[in-house]
Swiss-Prot record:
MF-aspect GO terms: oxidoreductase activity, acting on NAD(P)H, quinone or similar compound as acceptor
Name of this chain's protein: Na(+)-translocating NADH-quinone reductase subunit E
Enzyme Commission numbers on file: 7.2.1.1
Taxonomic source organism: Cellvibrio japonicus (strain Ueda107)
Chief localization: membrane
HAMAP family cross-referenced by the UniProt entry: NqrE
Main EC class the enzyme belongs to: translocase
Keyword Iron applies: no
Length: 202
């Protein structure tokens, strides 16, 4: 239990997907202009990441790894070369289901997210979560915690950035820095702030 709690804190703060690995930057920068849209996308990423990382873990463990099909009486088969395409398929299916649910029950949020909801399918933060899970050889419980933590870390980062940028609307920013210029500087300073969590011993 202590190990899982440590993994959760590490994935949210120390190894933050947006501010430590700079993954998912396209939607991170585009959707951080309004705090409501940022919260909506953040929640969507948390849900997709929490479901896809453990789903891909099960797929890898019981279908793709070497001798993973031993439960079906098939041995000596290694399908790990299909990992990328399989992970993308799982992610696409889950995002599609989520898109249909949001369209039906949360139309305002669905319209606010616009093109960025289907873009979660190809958002590198989602694929990155599954690939880190494979690289670090997480078991199922770890993959659930890591999926939630990495999604939550990304969501916290985008909501913080949206809050800062909304406050900056009332600031006298030099003309040359308006728009993406000040956004990049802000993200860099946020990243430096999150680096301080690296000194925590867990």
């Amino acid at each position: 239990m202590e190990h899982l709690l440590s993994l959760l804190v590490r994935s949210v703060f120390i190894e933050n997907m947006a501010l430590a690995f700079f993954l998912g930057m396209c939607s991170f920068l585009a959707m951080s202009k309004k705090i409501n849209a940022a919260i909506g996308l953040g929640i969507a990423v948390i849900v997709v990441q929490t479901v896809t990382v453990p789903a891909n873990n099960l797929l890898l463990t019981y279908l793709l790894k070497e001798d993973a099909l031993a439960w079906a009486g098939v041995t000596g088969v290694d399908l790990t070369f299909l990992s990328f395409i399989s992970f993308i398929g799982v992610i696409a299916a889950i995002v599609q289901i989520m898109e249909m649910v949001m369209d039906k029950y949360m139309p305002a949020l669905y319209n606010a997210l616009g093109v960025f909801l289907p873009l979660i399918t190809v958002n590198c933060v989602i694929m990155g979560g599954s690939l880190f899970m494979v690289e670090r050889d997480y078991h199922f419980a770890e993959s659930v915690v890591y999926g939630f933590g990495s999604g939550a870390g990304w969501a916290i980062a985008i909501v913080l950035l949206a809050g800062i940028l909304e406050k900056m609307k009332y600031s006298d920013i030099p003309e040359g820095l308006r728009g993406l210029g000040i956004t990049f500087i802000t993200v860099g300073l946020m990243s430096l702030g999150f680096m301080s969590f690296g000194g925590i011993s867990l």
